[in-house]
Structures are given as C-alpha cells and as structure tokens.
Amino acid sequence: MTQWKRRSRRKGMRTRNNKQLIKLILTKSREICNTIRPSQYNKRGRPRVYEDHLIVAALLIKILENLSLRDLEERLKDLFPKVPDFTTLHYRFRKLNRGYLKELIHRTAKEIMEKLQAKEFYCLIADGTGFGYAQAYELKWKKGKELRNVKSHVKTEVLVGVVRNKAIVVDINTGKSYADENMLLRSMLKELGFRARYFLGDAYYGKSAGVLEEIKKLRMESIVPVRDTAHTRVRNMYRLWAKRNYEIRRKVYRKNRYRVEQVIGIVKNRFGDRDNVYDFEIASLYVLGRFVLYNLILLLKLLLLCLNLLRITWASSRFIL
C-alpha cells in the first residue's frame, strides 16, 4: 500500500474510481498546452523543469480528489515517472497561465455540442456567485453589515448554455470580492464564440444598457426582467427592448432560468465552495478548475454513451448476420 493510500484512508479523503476521467484530464491538458503559448517566465526564480500540461493536470486532479499539496505530490507519483514536490507545485500554480483553463472550458463546450449534434444553444443564462477562501472561521460569527466587510471570496460570473436538455458551462470570469457582475459579464460577451437564440438573466442585468447592447450585437433575444416603476421609468432603448421581450417570452424565462443555479449548486456540492488558501490568484484558479471539471465530466458521460451505443449496434448487427 502506497503512502498516499495510507494517508487517504486515515484522513477520509475522497478516493473514487476516477481512472477514465483522469485519462481524459491528461489528454485534454496536453492538447491545450500544445496549442496555446506557454506561461511567461523570466530569468529570475526557479527554472522551468516541468511542462505546463503536467501542472494543469495536477491542478485538476487536486480539485477532483480534494487533495492537499503534499498528498497531491504522492498521488502524481502513480501517474508520472517524474513529479514536482509540493513546494514546486504551489509555485507553478501561482505562475500558471489562466488562459489554459478558460480555453479548456471553451473547447470542451464545443466538443459537447458536436457530440449532441447542435450548432447553437437554445439559450445562454448568466448568474453570479462566490467562492470563499481564507477567513473561514471569521465568517461563522459575523452577520449583516460586518459580514459584507469581509472580502475573502472570489466573485464568479458563470455563463451556461442549454441545448438538448443539457446545461454546459460556456465561460467563466472571476474578480475581486463584490466586483460588478455586469462588468464581468460584458467582457465575456465581447469574446463569446457561441450562438444562441435567447439570453436569460435576473433583474440586475436589466440595469446595464451596456450588457443589453452586447447581447443585441450577438443577435440574441434578451429575456431579462427590467424594473419599471413610478420613480424609475425605463427610457433607454436597450432596456425597453429587454422589457418587451421578457413580457412576451416569460415562459421561456421560467422554464430555463434555474439551470445556471443548478450548475452552480452541482459544482459547489461536488467540489466544495471554499478553499484553504490565502492568495486570491490561486483561489480564482481553483474556481476555474471546478467548472473545467464539470464540463469534462459531462463530456466523458457523452463519450461513454456513444461508445455503449456503438457496442450495442455492433452486437445487434453481428446477431443478424
């Protein structure tokens, strides 16, 4: 029994059978790192001994199996002949290019759509959430205004696409605590590489004419509730457009709005909503890794389903012959 297995039994870590998923992680990490320019390193600091694809795979395995850096080092010895120690892993996580993880989300989303034989999403849904780091004890006894002064969480904007009754993570953007969700979403929409019929969001996005303008440029119908009261009359053309769409297509909103919250809930339940780190950059890296794993798990399920269908087809054709 290896040292990692002894530790995992003693500490009660999650040790599910993730062999197929880990193989997919290793494959996709290598593909992404071969197509994107590597992380920038200057002459100062530690020499770059290990390839970026190994570091990306190590990050995802750490999140998947809820390992500490020391246990991750032992776990990697089962997968690679030469692995970095836990201090090098921490150092390389800090230097890792976040573009790798964002590109993994985009490419897995495209691959899932290809498996589903879909050219565009039925709707895109946006919502904001938060993932905590550090100061976990302090949050337990503070309330109200005191709680809002604690700034140890990663503001996360999630964009989910729905197609063929599947919810797929399309893009993720992170910012400091209490960052503006409209600003985070607007930067994602400017670089969006997917098409959709509808865009869904809560009333907060209805306040931003800039976000609604970007949605109209993408030729999507914005179904966003816009508050129109005696003291806050709607006069902006984009907000009026969103208000009319919401009144006409309210059923579409009610049937699909919950899907983004469902995805966030699945990610938090499976991989946790808090990280025991003190650095914001590493905490935001772990947040991106969580949503990468969500897409990879969904992709793996579709690949296994296609494989099973091929086996059934082959067996039935052999029986007929």
Swiss-Prot record:
<dbReference type="InterPro" id="IPR002559">
    <property type="entry name" value="Transposase_11"/>
</dbReference>
<protein>
    <recommendedName>
        <fullName>Uncharacterized protein aq_1391/aq_1640/aq_aa40</fullName>
    </recommendedName>
</protein>
<keyword id="KW-0614">Plasmid</keyword>
<dbReference type="Pfam" id="PF01609">
    <property type="entry name" value="DDE_Tnp_1"/>
</dbReference>
<dbReference type="GO" id="GO:0003677">
    <property type="term" value="F:DNA binding"/>
</dbReference>
<dbReference type="GO" id="GO:0004803">
    <property type="term" value="F:transposase activity"/>
</dbReference>
<dbReference type="GO" id="GO:0006313">
    <property type="term" value="P:DNA transposition"/>
</dbReference>
